[in-house]
């Protein structure tokens, strides 16, 4: 290591995923010790094993406090442009009964703690991430946003997780382009302060943010947004004229208003929306819809002539809900790719069993289908698939996904009959396993 160019060594040290290794390097080599002052990135994570050792009577006296390690590392690296400090996700499983109520050794959004190190590095800091220990932070309201906004004029990316945040004293941060708040209790019920103080945001991620009442996102430069909302807010509004990618998950808002004319990639998961108002999407190419009332949502959706790639699913399937596959093409007539989730498939197959599949010209434009099957009666399922194949004359690819706990014998008997019925189609079948499906056979 001593023979490497200093610039390369600094780059290697800056890329370490755990900056505790940087401290070990300082002890191992005089050269490394001198070069650590030029490190540009600092990442320190409190692991579950470290936490347990710090609590055990046998080992706690031999464990250096986490905050002390961090302060020492910051003091040895004054040129930092990226800082990430947090607790490992495994600490979420720690019980409240196992924690001293007055402990603050892992209360990382404590303003007193942050004041010890932030002023030393704020001049060059471009990215800051703090992931707090919820058990210690949930009952302590933090003024850290005010401190960060007063110190870090050049900050471009900010991420805070697992904390109770006040917006009192928050100053505008005009250079901040990316903000992530995850599992946060936020004292900004309408998001007015977020809109006012972060006007240049291009990326906004709000995941499990509580304390919201009537939130409105009003950001002129926003391009990408992830927003998962609890059932508390009665209305949700997004005004973002430059937004191109939106992933929105909510429960039952009485009002959902979207003014996002440039949206091209949209994932919407909503149990029910009484009032869903959107302006027509002229650029929307990729759409993912999930709802407990899929038919009602489709009825409220504006014409989606630009949509080419479409995914639909029903969150809570019941036999009384009537979702016809043809209804999709009344709203999205130019879709060439269709992914049908298991709930939507059940509803559509149930409607087919009662009344068949109506002709739609748009069905003839479909090129690819991914069907997440739930097979109750193999003959009904086959009849539904065959009817789809008859109507979709330009279909070239069809994938059938089965439940991982399903009947493999059923699947193996269904596949040969499908391929024999329509050999012109390229067939695939596989198993649904979380976000990534397992393909058992490709190009049958």
Q: Where do the language-model regions lie?
A:
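Leucine-rich repeat
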Residues: 3-6, 11, 15-210, 216-218, ...
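Conserved hydrophobic beta-strand positions in leucine-rich repeat
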Residues: 42, 83-85, 128-131, 156-160, ...
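Short, loop-centered acidic/histidine patches that primarily coordinate divalent metals
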Residues: 343, 371-374, 391-393, 400-405, ...
